[in-house]
From Swiss-Prot:
Pfam families: Ribosomal_L22. The keyword Membrane does not apply. GO terms for cellular component: chloroplast; cytosolic large ribosomal subunit. GO terms for molecular function: rRNA binding; structural constituent of ribosome. It comes from Pyropia yezoensis (Susabi-nori). InterPro entries: Ribosomal_uL22, Ribosomal_uL22_bac/chlpt-type, Ribosomal_uL22_bac/org-type, Ribosomal_uL22_CS, Ribosomal_uL22_sf. Its main location: plastid. This is Large ribosomal subunit protein uL22c. The keyword Ribonucleoprotein applies. This protein binds specifically to 23S rRNA. Part of the 50S ribosomal subunit.
Length: 117
C-alpha cells in the first residue's frame, strides 16, 4: 500500500520572452528544487540578463500560490522550472555588394511551478 501526499503546485508562465532558451535553462538549473527565498537571492546576484525575467515570473508564481491556493510564501520551493522554445523572429542584415544575411532572434516560454514543502 502506498501513501500519496496531495501536493498543490501553482505555476506562472512567461511567454514570448526575447531570449535564447539555451541561456534561460542555464539559470533555471540553478534554482530548480530550491526554496523560494533562496531562489530569489540567487537570481538577485547572478550576472545574467535573463535573471530579471525569471525573478518576475517566480514572484508571480508565489503570489498565485498565496492568493489562489492560500499557501505560505515562506514554505514554498521551486518544484518545476523549464524553458520551451518559442517562435523565432527572422530578420535580414544588409551586407556588402547587395547581399543580405539572415539573423534569427530566438524567443522562449518560461514555466515555473512552486509547491509547499
Amino acid at each position: 500500500m502506498s501513501i500519496t501526499k496531495n501536493v498543490k503546485e501553482t505555476k506562472a508562465v512567461g511567454k514570448y520572452i526575447r531570449l535564447s532558451p539555451h541561456k534561460v535553462r542555464r539559470v533555471l538549473d540553478q534554482i530548480r528544487g530550491r526554496k523560494y527565498q533562496e531562489a530569489l537571492i540567487i537570481l538577485e546576484f547572478m550576472p545574467y540578463r535573463v535573471c530579471s525575467h525569471i525573478k518576475q515570473i517566480l514572484e508571480s508564481a508565489a503570489a498565485n500560490a498565496e492568493h489562489n491556493d492560500g499557501l505560505n510564501k515562506n514554505q514554498l520551493f521551486v518544484s518545476k522550472a523549464f524553458a520551451d522554445k518559442g517562435p523565432t523572429l527572422k530578420r535580414f542584415q544588409p551586407r556588402a555588394q547587395g547581399r543580405a544575411f539572415p539573423i534569427h532572434k530566438p524567443t522562449c516560454h518560461i514555466t515555473l511551478g512552486v509547491s509547499e514543502l
